[in-house]
């Protein structure tokens, strides 16, 4: 029984940006960017979010721009 579970393929993550039809990631869209930030304020990894590498770079750039413009916090406020 354990062998059958080990042979099972993991389910592929659905790309949330492709699902919603989003082609351009804007730094002013904080509602979208918050989906890709952890509760600690870190940018989530590709393997967690399911986006492509190009989209991940665009998200990272948009989050950094939004932080610079004070639209997103650099770190979480909770301790």
Curated annotation (Swiss-Prot):
GO cellular component terms listed in the entry, alphabetical order: cytosolic small ribosomal subunit
Tree of life domain: Bacteria
GO function term, MF aspect, one: small ribosomal subunit rRNA binding
Gene3D superfamilies: Ribosomal protein S18
GO BP annotations listed: translation
InterPro entries: Ribosomal_bS18, Ribosomal_bS18_CS, Ribosomal_bS18_sf
Keywords: Ribonucleoprotein, Ribosomal protein, RNA-binding, rRNA-binding
Quaternary structure, from the entry: Part of the 30S ribosomal subunit. Forms a tight heterodimer with protein bS6.
Family, per entry: Belongs to the bacterial ribosomal protein bS18 family.
Function (record text): Binds as a heterodimer with protein bS6 to the central domain of the 16S rRNA, where it helps stabilize the platform of the 30S subunit.
Protein name: Small ribosomal subunit protein bS18
Source organism of the structure: Salinispora arenicola (strain CNS-205)
């Amino acid at each position: 029984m354990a062998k059958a579970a080990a042979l099972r393929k993991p389910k592929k993550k659905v790309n949330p940006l492709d699902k919603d039809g989003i082609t351009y990631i804007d730094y002013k869209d904080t509602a979208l960017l918050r989906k890709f930030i952890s509760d600690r304020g870190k940018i989530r990894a590709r393997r967690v979010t399911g986006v492509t590498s190009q989209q991940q770079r665009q998200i990272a750039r948009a989050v950094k721009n939004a932080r610079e413009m004070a639209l997103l916090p650099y770190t979480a406020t909770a301790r």
